[in-house]
Amino acid sequence: TDEVAFDAFEAFSNAYDKLGNLRPTIEPKATEHIPGMISLIQELIDTGHAYESGGDVYFGVRSFAEYGKLSRHSVDDLRAGDRVEPGDLKRDPLDFALWKAAKPGEPQWDSPWGPGRPGWHIECSAMATEYLGPGFDIHAGGSDLIFPHHENEIAQSEAPHGETFARYWMHNGMLNLSGEKMAKSTGHVVTLLGALERWDPLAGRLFYLRTHYRKPLEFSTDALDDAEASLARLRAFRRRMPEVVEDASDADALDAFKAAMDNDLDVAGALGVVFDV
């Protein structure tokens, strides 16, 4: 599993660099933060929001009155089986795992509840809290993670002390191929590194930016070709920037550009202003 994780991280990092993105200040690894996860789980047990059952530990969803506020789900409307983990050890079908008892062939760590591994929601809360504190400004992620992952993050992070976990949530739309979400597990995917071998990396960035981040994005060779043509136009615009800046009549364009960027980071709208100048 370490080898698989390393290979995936290397591929991600290489693509990140080719796109010209700045590296994150911290890139924490879940397996290096197990003690922090155990500590948070114990705090949830101590405050009455979690319970041990057969070596597993579950978060009691109904113990957190605000559960569902991000996804706008009502607890009473949620059904077992609707993206909810099944399990006979739960007090309530909606409860989710914070710690799972060890199974043969799976990674495991020692804990007060016996050997096992953390649930996939608690990892993010523990690492975010360690590096950003109990409350921070912006949490981003794919729109497919709103429920249950981000909803569960909020619950397990806010339940012990009541402080807001993240003040702003930015959820990006899915990247689709032939109308379906890309998924490596099914082979329905075009890798970013593969695409960057064919197209200018800056065209790749422009391809992403020309659609508002909350909307789904359709991958196609035509779309990337068009992004390269648009990139050429932007480079031409950059070359004539001095004369554009000297033209006072473009003050309205600058205001429109700023207004678009201030409107939920509407880069696509801001680029439209640039292309109209």
List where the protein language model places each region:
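The substrate-binding groove and active-site-proximal loops of carbohydrate-active enzymes
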Residues: T1-D2, T25-T31, G142-S143
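An acidic site on a long C-lobe helix of protein kinase domains
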Residues: A8, E32-G36, A270
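Hydrophobic/basic alpha-helical segments enriched in Actinobacteria
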Residues: K29, G48-E52, K184, G194, ...
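Short secondary-structure capping/junction motifs at helix and strand boundaries
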Residues: S13-P28, T47-D56
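N-terminal, positively charged nucleic-acid-binding surface of large information/translation enzymes
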Residues: T1-L22, L40
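Hydrophobic face of alpha-helices
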Residues: D2-A5, F9, S125, L254, ...
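Helix-loop elements that line ligand-binding/catalytic pockets
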Residues: P216-F219, A223-V277
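Alpha-helical recognition segments enriched in aromatics with Gly/Pro capping
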Residues: P35-P242
